[in-house]
């Protein structure tokens, strides 16, 4: 970046009234002894053969999705992280149910664990943590991504960066330079594709169409393509209770879908609605189970349009489906 209105790409200079930084993030490995033995999620696409055993470090969607992939292909999978449950930004019930379901598929979780070092033992990597040691054929650092802002000359033109290199912005995605904005993974926070898309759309609308357009993170549907999958839109129960103390009803159900009864599979589905009691506005929809991303995509329309619990109750159910449970929830489990 040459100045507040100009960037250089190779030998070409491009100028504009506004500049938007959307350079994403990159994988990183924690600075621990033996870190050169660790792979990142980028490296996994270049494996020449399926490892017999895999340890993944990280509680986020990348590590959990790859855990499901490797377990499904027959690898022995261990997932380690420092917290008690995965997906720290998700609803508490989602986190708990997903961990239980993944464990039922044979995935081992080591929680409350911090990595101390990695060592090579023959053709195995020994993982040393404060919770003990074990061996795996490969070790994957899936500890998130860091902003890909190094070497862009951002600070030289006055753009303020955070400790991890993230671009510091206000609620309108504006940086410390009036004509420069930033969206997506490079600003830190939630690193999911729908969030970056929503930020970009809101920014474009505000600059060129509607000056009052804003980014509404709670209307952004997201999915985690684990086994089973997660779909969510709106506020978590924890967020809703914090912003609406004493005014939240929670509707929740857990069941085994009909398609799993004949093959006698143990997999269950969890569905949850978070509702503001005073006006019956649905604040959040959450699901763990088969087809969760597909179902949540449709429910995101309802939340964006301001659907109430009465709207859900009036909606006829398509039977027999799993999705019908969202419109058949009648009694709150928490008031």
Feature names for model-found ranges:
Residues 225-236, 241-335:
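Flexible, glycine-rich terminal cap/loop adjacent to redox cofactors
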Residues 13-24, 55-57, 77, 134-144, ...:
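Short hydrophobic core segments
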Residues 26-28, 160-162, 210-219, 244-251:
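A short alpha-helix-loop-beta-strand transition element characteristic
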Residues 1-18, 109, 116-126:
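Feature captures the FAD/FMN-dependent oxidoreductase FAD-binding
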Residues 36-51, 134-209:
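FAD-site-proximal beta/loop scaffold in flavoenzymes
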Residues 21-82, 109, 155-157, 161-172, ...:
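Glycine-rich dinucleotide-binding loop and its adjacent helix/turn
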Residues 3-4, 23, 40-42, 111-113, ...:
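Short loop/edge segments at beta-strand edges and connector loops
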Residues 45-46, 51-55, 61-126, 130, ...:
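Rossmann-like dinucleotide-binding cores of NAD(P)H-dependent redox enzymes
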């Amino acid at each position: 970046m040459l100045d507040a209105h100009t960037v250089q790409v190779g030998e070409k200079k491009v100028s504009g009234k506004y500049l938007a930084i959307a350079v994403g993030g990159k994988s990183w490995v924690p600075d621990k002894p033996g870190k050169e033995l660790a792979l990142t999620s980028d490296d996994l696409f270049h494996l020449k053969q399926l490892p017999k055993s895999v340890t993944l470090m990280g509680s986020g969607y990348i590590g959990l999705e790859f855990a499901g992939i490797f377990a499904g292909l027959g690898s022995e999978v261990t997932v380690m992280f420092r917290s008690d449950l995965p997906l720290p930004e998700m609803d508490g019930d989602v986190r708990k149910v997903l961990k239980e379901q993944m464990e039922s598929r044979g995935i081992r979780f080591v929680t409350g664990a911090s990595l101390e070092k990695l060592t090579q033992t023959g053709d195995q990597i020994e993982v040393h943590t404060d919770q003990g040691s074990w061996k795996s054929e490969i070790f994957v650092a899936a500890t998130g991504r860091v902003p890909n802002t190094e070497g862009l000359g951002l600070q030289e033109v006055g753009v303020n960066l955070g400790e991890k290199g993230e671009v510091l912005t206000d609620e309108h995605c504006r940086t410390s330079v009036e004509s420069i904005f930033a969206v997506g993974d490079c600003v830190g926070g939630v690193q999911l594709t729908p969030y970056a898309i929503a930020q970009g759309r809101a920014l474009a609308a505000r600059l060129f169409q509607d000056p009052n357009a804003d980014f509404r993170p709670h209307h952004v549907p997201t999915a985690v393509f684990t086994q089973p999958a997660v779909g969510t839109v709106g506020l978590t129960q924890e967020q809703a209770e914090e912003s609406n103390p004493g005014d939240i009803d929670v509707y929740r159900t857990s069941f085994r879908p009909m398609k799993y009864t004949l093959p006698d599979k143990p997999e269950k589905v969890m569905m949850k609605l978070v509702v503001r009691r005073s006006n019956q506005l649905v604040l959040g929809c959450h699901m763990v189970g088969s087809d969760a991303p597909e179902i949540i995509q449709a429910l995101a329309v309802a939340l964006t349009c301001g659907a109430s619990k009465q709207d859900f109750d009036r909606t006829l159910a398509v039977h027999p489906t799993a999705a019908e449970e969202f419109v058949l929830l009648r009694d709150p489990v928490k008031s």
